Each structure stands twice: as C-alpha cells, then as structure tokens.
Amino acid sequence: MRLIDFISERDRYLSFPWMATAGLQLCGYTLYDVYLSPQRQLEVAQRMNQEFDADFSYPMDDGAIFVETLGLPLLKPEFDFPSVLENPVKTTKDLEELQVPNPYSDGRMPLNLKALELIATRIRKPLSLSIQGPFTLAVELVGATDFVRAIIRNPDFIEKVLDFTNQVVGDYARATVKAGTKFICISEPTAVILSPDRFEKMVAVRLRALYNSLGPGVWKVLHICGDTRVLLPHMLKCGAEGLSLDQVMDLSSIIKKFPKNMIILGNLDPIYVLRELSPEEVRAKTLELLRSMKGHSNYMFSFGCDCTPDTPLHNLRAAMEASRTRFVDL
C-alpha cells in the first residue's frame, strides 16, 4: 500500500507531528536516559501515544546518531538535542580515517534498532522515523564554511564525502526498515543553501538511490527547512512519496500545483504558534491550517519543524486534538 492510499478515504486528515524532545517532559528523563535504554524509548513512545494520539508511533528523534557514532565531539544538553562541537574532516586523508558504522554493532545504533523493534511490536500504529540526510551529515563532518568553499575549489573531495555519508545513512536506514520502520523521513535542512542545479547533482541523485534501496514497502518522505520554492521541482523528483515543508511555505498555494499522488506535510509554526500562543489560539491556528487544505486528499497535518524543548504540553495537546477534527466539522 502506498502512503497516498493509506491516508485517503478517511473522514479527517492524518497527523505526523515533529515532537522533538517533548516526551522528556512527560517521563522526567534526560535525553540520554532515553537514548541509552530501548525500554525507556518504548516507555516514552507509549506515553506520547497516550497523550497526543498521532497516527504513527515514533521513537525519540536522534539526529546525532551518525556524528556521534563517527566520533565527533558533541555538546550534550540534558533536555535538548546534541550539537557538533568540531568538524574534523578537512581532507581526503581525514575522510579515509573514518569507517562506515555497522548498524548492528557500532555505538548506540544497536540500541536504536532494538528500540524500534519494541515500539513496532508494542504500539499498533505504523512506526515512523526521522533521520539526518547524507548532505546534511556531510556538512556536519566538514563544517559549513569549508564545505561551501570546497564545492568550488575541491569538488572531488566533496563527492567523496557525499559518497561516504550516503553509505552511512543508507546502511542505517535499511537496518531500521528491517527493525520495523514503515514511514521514514529523511531530513536535509542544510540543502536549502543550494541552487537547484547543485541540489540535483549533490542531493537529489543520491536520495533517489537511497529511497529506492529501502524497498517498495516503506513510505518515504523528505523534509527540508526554510524557503524551498526554487527547489520544489527537484524535491518532487527525489524518490519520496511526500514532502514535509517549513512554516514559511504557503501550503494553500503550493498544494494546488502539487501532484495528486504526492503527499504534502506541514506546517504549523512550532515557534510562534506552538511555543508562544495559548491553547485556544493554537487550536484556532490548527483549524485554520486544516481548512486551507480542505478538499485536498493528499495532505497530512504536521509541524513546520521540530517543536522546541520548552513547548508547553497543553499547546501540543491542543494542536493534536484539533488536528483530528473531521472534514464535516471543518
């Protein structure tokens, strides 16, 4: 069954929210309390399912799994995602010192796979997962400034880095599918810096191969932050079944030109709306978004990006409750 078939013929829009670390507020754990325990991953996933009742199950997001397994130094806040402190890959020699991780034996990857197996078998909803994309991982390894310079000055080096990161992400993604992942979203936030031509050559070509390697039974989505209007024609041809778009994008105009067999996801503002407004205002903004999508069966409700760690839980509840409003009541 395709993703478009799964979401069609419903009496309401389905939801795939970007909850980030919200589950920590529910369970009182630090981030690495959860990352290091498949059982706690399951506990958080079950609590999130009870509290917010999305249409997919999901583990705690783990955008740092690749850089951490590759040995990059990280800043590790207790209640927010880790961030890279150094970008060590400046030459081909630096790159050759790294090895593609084995998802079944290296770092925390085996713990994540076990957590996915638990969630897939204990929660009776399709298991969704968001992972960092190969281009964004490459920029993390090299550093944004050096990466952009090398695109012009040393393109062969950049190609080697991208080939490496594509294998890292691909091997892990395929392992997560075997563990039970049904819906996989590849996040390429850094790709927004590229021109359409460079996006096609550096991102789209590799994504098509990666998505294809996951097999036909997996629902595939691409997320890129920011204003991606100039990239949309190429994003639509990346091999994904759906595109997740940022809150700066006008979905009501974009969806009119969107292929009917492609899903568009988004794009409630996680900053201005979810963090700053009252529950009543969040509910109103959610309903406003749903009404703007009315009549389009290829839409799924989501946030424009991850919500912040300090997002009030009552606002998340308000958004998710409103997102389940039936078409006849919009």
Where are the regions a protein language model picked out?
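Intrinsic-disorder/low-complexity, polar/charged segments
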Residues: 37-39, 91-94, 278
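Glycine-rich, N-terminal phosphate-binding loop and its surrounding beta-alpha-beta segment
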Residues: 45-74, 101
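Active-site-flanking structural segment that lines cofactor/substrate pockets
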Residues: 23, 30-53, 57
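Active-site loop segments of alpha/beta catalytic cores
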Residues: 1-23, 29-32, 55, 79-81, ...
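A contiguous, low-structure linker/loop signature
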Residues: 65-102, 118-125
